[in-house]
């Protein structure tokens, strides 16, 4: 499959692009897209190199996203410079108001990268150790052996609140808060199936709901305020924020594949595992800040981008808030996908080749996760497309 795609994309480059499209792309008159203000130092690519990446990205969009009815935003960057930027569809299908570069999307599980790196910032600043037991920070949390690190790398053994609270009789007429998740774990410990800490990897939203509470306890600030003052404002991420219930009627809605609006549910209050809204350009600023080392020491990033789960053979792994592809030649893909209601998201960083792929959608569309088919344009990356997760 990958070889066939590579051949297709090469043909598209030679022909100057496979399809004409009336969809809006953001490119200046010189054929070079602009770098977001505040993004940091980005190199200017030679025109031939820029054109190559633009045509490959456009061909990917026309071959995979456009035929699937994609409704969202796509951005591809090389060395911090945007080589392709595309906004397709509507904020609301009822009003048919067009999406644009300032439209914040629900990031779903891509939000975990901010939660995890916020914890890493507290660690770097000496406010906590990732080897600290969670009970040190969360009163009543009597689960020995569960550390901050096992929450970060999904090796805690805890059950997923998204499923287990309903199974144990939670009244869905009452919205779940982060504190409710903690209280539920404390009060129902004897009724829950809990794995041995650090025994194996199990992706679990509970981990990041608890990490948000750890951030609040250690920093003395609300989660949204800590992220705003530590990341969003310093990096110029003006269209990025944490959802709150009072924003329900003003944030971008999501839709199922039939274009039917997805309702908010009792699970939509919890943050840390989800509930950050952002744009493709703001995520590029986040990527550049991580890449340039402006906010983290190299050793912190090395720990975040290291794998911690080796029970299964293969290149897939998970770091401290990042999904990873760790290749035998030491190349790695650092990324996170997301899925919540009708929101599908991809945030991929090809750190060895200084390339970034960001796709955000608010109408359910699994073809968004075919983004990995683009990666071979930037380097030697093998394997099938990366699937989505919640």
Where are these regions (language model features)?
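Bacterial Sec-dependent N-terminal signal peptides
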Residues: 1-28
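Catalytic loop of the DD-peptidase/beta-lactamase superfamily, centered on the K-T-G motif
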Residues: 18-87, 216, 228, 233, ...
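Short linear capping/connector segments at secondary-structure termini
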Residues: 42-46, 92, 131-140, 164-170, ...
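Conserved beta-strand positions that form and line the central face of beta-propeller blades
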Residues: 44, 87, 98, 106, ...
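Short active-site loop at a secondary-structure junction
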Residues: 65-73, 95-151, 193-204, 271-272, ...
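Short, solvent-exposed turn/loop segments enriched in Gly/Ser/Thr/Pro and often Arg
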Residues: 78, 82, 134, 140, ...
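Solvent-exposed coil/turn segments that connect beta secondary-structure elements
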Residues: 79-81, 91-93, 156-157, 247, ...
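Short, surface-exposed loop or secondary-structure junction motifs
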Residues: 146-341
């Amino acid at each position: 499959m990958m070889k066939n795609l590579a051949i297709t994309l090469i043909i598209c480059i030679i022909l100057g692009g496979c399809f004409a499209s009336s969809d809006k792309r953001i490119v200046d008159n010189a054929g070079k897209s602009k770098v977001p203000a505040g993004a940091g130092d980005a190199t200017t690519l030679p025109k031939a190199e820029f054109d190559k990446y633009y045509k490959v990205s456009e061909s990917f969009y026309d071959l995979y996203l456009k035929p699937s009815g994609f409704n969202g935003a796509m951005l591809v960057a090389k060395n911090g410079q945007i080589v392709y930027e595309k906004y397709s569809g509507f904020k609301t299908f009822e009003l048919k108001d067009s999406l644009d570069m300032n439209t914040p999307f629900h990031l779903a599980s891509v939000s975990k990268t901010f939660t995890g790196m916020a914890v890493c910032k507290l660690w770097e600043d000496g406010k906590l150790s990732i080897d600290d037991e969670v009970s040190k920070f969360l009163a009543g949390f009597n689960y020995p052996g569960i550390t901050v690190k096992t929450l970060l790398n999904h090796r805690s053994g805890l059950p997923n609140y998204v499923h287990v609270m309903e199974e144990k009789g939670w009244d869905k007429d009452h919205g779940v808060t982060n504190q409710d998740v903690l209280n539920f774990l404390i009060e129902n410990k004897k009724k829950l199936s809990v794995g041995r800490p650090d025994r194996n990897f199990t992706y679990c939203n509970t981990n990041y709901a608890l990490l948000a509470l750890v951030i609040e306890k250690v920093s003395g600030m609300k989660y949204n305020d800590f992220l705003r003052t530590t990341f969003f404002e310093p990096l110029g991420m003006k269209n990025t924020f944490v959802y709150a219930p009072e924003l329900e009627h003003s944030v971008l809605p999501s839709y199922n594949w039939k274009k039917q609006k997805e309702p908010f549910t009792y699970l939509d209050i919890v943050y840390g595992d989800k509930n950050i809204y952002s744009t493709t350009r703001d995520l590029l600023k986040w990527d550049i800040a991580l890449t340039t080392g402006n906010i983290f020491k190299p050793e912190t990033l090395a720990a975040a981008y290291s794998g911690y789960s080796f029970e299964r053979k293969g290149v897939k792994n998970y770091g401290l808030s990042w999904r990873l592809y760790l290749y035998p030649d030491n190349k790695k893909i650092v990324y996170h996908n997301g899925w919540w209601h009708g929101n599908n998201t991809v945030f991929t960083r090809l750190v060895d080749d200084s390339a970034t792929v960001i796709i955000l959608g608010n109408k359910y569309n699994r073809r968004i996760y075919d983004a990995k088919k683009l990666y071979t344009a930037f380097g030697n990356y093998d394997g099938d497309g990366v699937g989505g997760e919640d």
